[in-house]
């Protein structure tokens, strides 16, 4: 707990905190396959073979988020908050003392006219302040919404080694609010074939849907 307090006092982003610590509280449960639906005005989400876990909404006006949960990935709740909505870890794939993690955050800003690129640039600036290096970006879409994939090296911190990190950022507007959902997955052994396949599944199958989606 002392390490967690020290990190908080250093004002690191909450998502970064979970990424650095790997979290340490596991919630038992089994993911259930959710309907493969999307906002009909914005495109279709991609289907993947892993079951989908629905991420709890904190308000009914928020978008619905769903994330694939391949075998061996366990849901964590230690740092769940208004910002950090979901995290999971796979201890079976641990390497160099670090287990791969997947973390989802959700932020919002009033209005729906914000340029998505401005929001993407803000997120990348935050990563640079956090100490990320070797950043590369590529534009994509997720469920029809503008998205960006950022790959980078996460800095070592204490006993936590440097990590290969991929972040998927998606911007979607609903009613009078713009939301930025961020999915980050990382490992200290990115060449592990099981991790590579799991990461692809999680990133490809992540969903952002309208608040009233089935």
In which residue ranges do the predicted regions lie?
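Extracytoplasmic
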Residues: 60-64, 97-101, 145-147
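Beta-strand elements of well-folded, non-transmembrane domains
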Residues: 108, 156-158, 187
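Signature of long, low-cysteine stretches enriched in small and polar/charged residues
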Residues: 118-172
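N-terminal targeting sequences that direct proteins away from the cytosol to non-cytosolic compartments
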Residues: 2-86, 92, 160, 186-214
């Amino acid at each position: 707990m002392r390490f967690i307090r020290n990190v908080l006092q250093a004002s690191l982003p909450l998502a970064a905190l979970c990424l650095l610590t790997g979290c340490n509280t596991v919630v038992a449960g089994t993911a259930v396959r959710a309907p493969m639906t999307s906002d009909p005005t914005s495109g279709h989400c991609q289907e993947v073979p892993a079951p989908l876990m629905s991420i709890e909404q904190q308000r009914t006006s928020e978008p619905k988020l769903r994330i694939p949960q391949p075998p061996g990935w366990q849901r964590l709740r230690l740092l769940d908050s208004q910002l950090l909505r979901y995290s999971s870890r796979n201890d079976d794939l641990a390497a160099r003392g670090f287990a791969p993690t997947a973390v989802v955050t959700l932020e919002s800003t009033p209005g729906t006219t914000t340029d998505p690129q401005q929001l993407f640039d803000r997120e990348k600036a935050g990563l640079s302040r956090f100490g990320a290096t070797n950043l590369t970006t590529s534009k994509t879409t997720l469920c029809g919404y503008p998205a960006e994939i950022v790959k980078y090296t996460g800095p070592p911190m204490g006993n936590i080694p440097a990590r290969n990190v991929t972040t998927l950022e998606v911007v979607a507007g609903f009613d009078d609010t713009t939301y930025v959902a961020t999915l980050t997955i990382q490992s200290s052994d990115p060449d592990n074939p099981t991790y590579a396949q799991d990461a692809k599944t999680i990133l490809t199958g992540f969903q952002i849907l309208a608040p009233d989606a089935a």
